[in-house]
Regions:
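Generic hydrophobic alpha-helical segments
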Residues: 14-15
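A short gly/proline-enriched turn/hairpin at secondary-structure junctions
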Residues: 36-50, 64
Length: 134
């Protein structure tokens, strides 16, 4: 792994840790001002396309409100050049307690100037579990 790739891998590990702390300020500090986030689902073939810090921040905050106990259990991280992949398992209970989600996923990243320019999220489409399942 090159030094360049190592720095990007460390960035992705820190990004995942910030998600698990629900630290949106830290997340946004790791993204470019003109960042793009392609959501898990949406009207477009790539999900919804959110552009810029304000839109991406709002989406991250909404996820954390919707799933107050959300965690992304980090799996392998792969980096080559200006592209990266982070595998994870998402777990979270809906805020109203009605259901729990547990599913594997990954993010595809594009880096620019030492930050994340694009985050493209993918997750297995699994039915919600009963909320009382641990």
């Amino acid at each position: 792994m090159t030094e360049h790739d190592r720095r990007h891998a460390e960035l992705l590990a820190a990004f995942g840790a910030a998600f698990n702390r629900h630290d949106v300020d830290a997340l946004m500090s790791m993204m470019t001002q003109d960042c793009v986030f392609f959501t898990l689902a949406g009207d477009g073939v790539h999900g919804n396309e959110l552009r810029g810090q304000a839109a991406v921040r709002a989406a991250f905050e909404a996820t954390m409100r919707a799933f107050p106990d959300a965690q992304w259990v980090q799996g392998p991280i792969f980096v080559t050049g200006d592209r990266g992949v982070s595998q994870w398992t998402f777990t979270g209970t809906k805020a109203d307690g009605s259901a729990r989600i547990e599913a594997e996923g990954c993010d595809l990243f594009t880096f620019r100037d030492g930050r994340i320019a694009v985050k493209n999220a993918f997750r297995k489409d699994r039915p919600p579990l009963p909320a009382n399942r641990g």
